[in-house]
């Protein structure tokens, strides 16, 4: 299957050249596979700098943009930049010129532009950022981790359905289980919205819903899908990443290599904007090196698996 991936070189915490070099590393690692190609989106200045500084004979195509979305741009400001690298990349995705689009840039802008340009599944009220995290039993899926700060119980139900569809379409669990991220395991814990969500999830999924789950229990692997609002989910994810970075810093070489591989969040692909009819991947703004390499590689695998089409089919 031929796969063409688009990537925004602009807007992240690192220089566009850092992202470009990782892109070339991915290309070289898959040199024997002629069915994979890339299109990069960057400002004219960055494109000229790349073409004058690198001698790679088989460059990915670079589409020059008039502007780019900065990390501190509001969603409205991003929409007004109609010829930004992010907007052009999403236009290419909308027009089926690429099979997936990756960005390390402004999350709110990416979500807003994606919703404006890419159709949402008919049964989905709001897309959610979906990630995989390592657990003692393999990995779990958690959503939302930052697309929606405030959501209602019906939207949380939609997240659960998308997470279930994602797990099923990738064949990760025959009978996936669901948990609601909360401040305690008791049914009455949390806000009124959490209590309503608990009741809806229980009525909908019955035995597959195992109730509330505390953040510290996620890594035990007690559930396959963790449902959260974007505010709580984002704090959980960034705390988990910070703890791993802290352990790696203080333990260094004392951390066994197999343990490191199991705990290392950088081996997992970036966050999928789940609920869109086409594949959009948000990598961490500070992603570089291995984490970005794996984010790009994971996007290739998801595109090949036609994950969006399979999730839509499962939801239908």
UniProtKB/Swiss-Prot annotation:
- InterPro entries in the cross-refs: FA_synthesis, Phospholipid_synth_PlsX-like
Is Repeat among this UniProt entry's keywords?
A: no
Entry's EC annotation? 2.3.1.274
- What does the record give as its pathway? Lipid metabolism; phospholipid metabolism
Family of this protein: Belongs to the PlsX family.
PANTHER family this protein is in? Answer: FATTY ACID/PHOSPHOLIPID SYNTHESIS PROTEIN PLSX (PTHR30100), PHOSPHATE ACYLTRANSFERASE (PTHR30100:SF1)
Protein's name according to its UniProt entry: Phosphate acyltransferase
**Which GO molecular function annotation, any one, does this entry have?**
phosphate:acyl-[acyl carrier protein] acyltransferase activity
- Chief subcellular location: cytoplasm
> What is its quaternary makeup?
Homodimer. Probably interacts with PlsY.
**The reaction(s) this protein catalyses:** a fatty acyl-[ACP] + phosphate = an acyl phosphate + holo-[ACP]
Q: Which GO terms describe its biological process?
A: fatty acid biosynthetic process; phospholipid biosynthetic process
């Amino acid at each position: 299957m031929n796969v063409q991936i688009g990537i925004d070189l602009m807007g992240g915490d690192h220089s566009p050249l850092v992202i470009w070099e990782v892109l070339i590393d991915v290309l070289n690692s898959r040199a024997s596979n002629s069915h994979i190609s890339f299109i990069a989106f960057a400002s004219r200045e960055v494109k000229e700098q790349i073409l004058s500084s690198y001698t790679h004979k088989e460059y990915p195509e670079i589409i020059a943009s008039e502007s780019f979305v900065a990390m501190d741009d509001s969603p409205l400001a991003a929409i007004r930049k109609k010829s930004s690298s992010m907007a052009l990349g999403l236009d290419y995705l909308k027009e089926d010129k690429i099979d997936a689009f990756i960005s390390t840039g402004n999350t709110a802008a990416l979500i807003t532009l994606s919703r404006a340009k890419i159709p949402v599944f008919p049964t989905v009220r709001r897309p959610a950022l979906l990630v995989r995290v390592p657990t003692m039993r393999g990995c779990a899926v958690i959503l939302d981790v930052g697309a929606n700060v405030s959501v209602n119980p019906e939207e949380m139900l939609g997240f659960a359905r998308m997470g279930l569809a994602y797990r099923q379409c990738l064949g990760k669990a025959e009978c996936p289980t669901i948990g609601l991220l909360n401040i305690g395991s008791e049914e009455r814990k949390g806000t009124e919205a959490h209590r309503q969500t608990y009741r809806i999830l229980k009525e909908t999924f019955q035995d597959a819903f195992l109730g509330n789950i505390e953040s510290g229990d996620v890594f035990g692997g007690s559930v396959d899908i963790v449902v959260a609002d974007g505010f709580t989910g984002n704090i959980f994810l960034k705390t988990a990443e910070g703890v791993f970075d802290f352990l790696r810093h203080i333990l260094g070489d004392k951390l066994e290599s197999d343990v490191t591989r199991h705990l290392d969040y950088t081996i997992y692909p970036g966050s999928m904007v789940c609920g869109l009819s086409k594949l959009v991947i948000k990598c961490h703004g500070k992603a570089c090196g291995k984490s970005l390499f794996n984010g790009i590689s994971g996007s290739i695998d998801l595109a090949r698996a036609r994950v969006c089409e399979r999730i839509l089919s499962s939801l239908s």
